[in-house]
């Protein structure tokens, strides 16, 4: 009995030692399994922003030309200042035009007098014709003279109206509200009616247009994606953001007005026109800008953080994922474009895949890893085409 007890005690001790070793081995194995941060992919939608070059264009342009000839006797504006519709810009010497008006009024008075006398003569001839005291020819002559006299009155009235208009044209006014440019004439200059050179240009800059160019390929691709339902367009006016030449974002949001149905044969592009508020005059005509046109939202898109995408020696994009058994796998993917700090992946991955985004230096394909949730699961989505 004692002998059995002596043999049992060492056996129990050895068993306990083996159990302790197994537990310690399991702990060491768990401790050696690297932890990696993963993002579980789920389909979503992204805003599609087309980045297009363009230039600013005045909303309205008025090239001021004289409609009557004469000598400029006064300039009534300061170059570069705002002028309102109807404001006087130049004064042409009105004296010759006033004389023409006076002459036209005199001609009208003479025509009215002649017409009055012709009417009296015609009425007399008409009365005498009934009693056969005058011939039919004398009556017809009197009627013709009356018609001619009345026609001369009409011509004289038109001459007075034209002379009055010409006198008004001596005061050269702005047809629009805008900013005046550099004057091409000074006081004392002789100008002619409807001359080729403008006196000054007035431009309305608030609001202001931005003319954008888009390649025909991109234009057609966008139409196809909208028609197929891949892109859901914005309802109502299409919003447009603007980046200035210095890299800063313009503070005002514009809207897309229309797209030109004609393709430029030399550039193979179409023109889009956007309109922007310009209350502070920050946008000037001819400025080069870059516009971000909100085309809509692309549906069922997979976004992968940039930390989870690498490129191999052949330049192809790859990603490491954890499969259902927590084994690291290498996937070759198609990463079409970057959106902020994420890639749009069009092939190689699917919804539900766990993409490794941190701890990459501690793993390689084929080994096991322990997943921890990453803080990058949710991110804003804006896609630039």
Swiss-Prot record:
PROSITE patterns in UniProt: PROKAR_LIPOPROTEIN
Pfam family, one: CusB_dom_1
Signal peptide: 1-20
Biological processes, Gene Ontology terms: bile acid and bile salt transport; response to antibiotic; response to toxic substance
Gene3D superfamilies linked to this entry: 2.40.30.170, 2.40.420.20, 2.40.50.100, Helix hairpin bin
UniProt entry tagged with the keyword Membrane: yes
Compartments it resides in: Cell inner membrane
Protein name in UniProt: Multidrug resistance protein MdtE
Native source species: Escherichia coli O157:H7
């Amino acid at each position: 009995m004692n002998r059995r007890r002596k043999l049992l005690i060492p056996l129990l001790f050895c068993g306990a030692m083996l159990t302790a070793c197994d537990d310690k081995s399991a702990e060491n194995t768990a401790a050696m399994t690297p932890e990696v941060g993963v993002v579980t992919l789920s389909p979503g939608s992204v805003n599609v922003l087309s980045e297009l070059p363009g230039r600013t264009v005045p909303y309205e342009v008025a090239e001021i030309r004289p409609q009557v000839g004469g000598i400029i006797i006064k300039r009534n504006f300061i170059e570069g200042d705002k002028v309102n519709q109807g404001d006087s810009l130049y004064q042409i010497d009105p004296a010759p035009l006033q004389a023409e008006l006076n002459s036209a009024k005199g001609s009208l008075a003479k025509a009215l007098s002649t017409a009055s006398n012709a009417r009296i003569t015609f009425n007399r001839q008409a009365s005498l014709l009934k009693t056969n005291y005058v011939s039919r020819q004398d009556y017809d002559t009197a009627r013709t003279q009356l018609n001619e006299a009345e026609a001369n009155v009409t011509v004289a009235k038109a001459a007075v109206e034209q002379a009055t208009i010409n006198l008004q044209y001596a005061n050269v006014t702005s047809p629009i509200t805008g900013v005046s440019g550099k004057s091409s004439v000074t006081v004392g200059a002789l100008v002619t009616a409807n001359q080729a050179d403008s006196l000054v240009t007035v431009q309305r800059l608030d609001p202001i247009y931005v003319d954008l160019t888009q390649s025909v390929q991109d234009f057609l691709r966008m139409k196809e994606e909208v028609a197929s339902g891949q892109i859901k367009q914005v309802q109502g006016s299409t919003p447009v953001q603007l980046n200035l030449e210095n890299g800063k974002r313009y503070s005002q949001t514009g809207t897309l007005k229309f797209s030109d149905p004609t393709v430029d044969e030399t550039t193979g592009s179409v023109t889009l026109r956007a309109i922007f508020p310009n209350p502070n005059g920050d946008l000037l005509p001819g400025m080069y800008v870059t516009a971000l046109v909100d085309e809509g939202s692309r549906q069922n898109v997979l976004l992968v953080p940039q930390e989870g995408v690498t490129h191999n020696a052949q330049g192809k994009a790859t990603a490491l994922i954890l499969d259902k058994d927590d084994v690291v796998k290498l996937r070759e993917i198609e990463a079409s474009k970057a959106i902020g700090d994420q890639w749009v992946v069009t092939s190689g991955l699917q919804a539900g895949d766990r993409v490794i985004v941190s701890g990459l230096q501690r793993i390689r394909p084929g080994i096991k890893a322990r997943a921890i949730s990453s803080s990058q699961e949710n991110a804003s989505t804006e896609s630039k085409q």
